[in-house]
């Protein structure tokens, strides 16, 4: 049986999921976001607890400005103004509120 080799980014996404999984009712990974026929991108991790959504963007290196821009754009199009946004740097294992 052939094993699938995960990318560094995918390993970091799974690492973050394992860190936060006990705090949420459900977690979705690599969620594509589309508007009409146009792709707006992908959210690395969406976590739900009750009626509250938290969005997580994972980067291999510390590129917080790019992550914030992506999260803000997704929140705008999904009308999730009250959702909390987080950035996770896999290299430094740092989780930051953005």
Language model features with spans:
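Intrinsically disordered, low-complexity Ser/Thr/Pro/Gly-rich regulatory segments
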Residues: 1-98
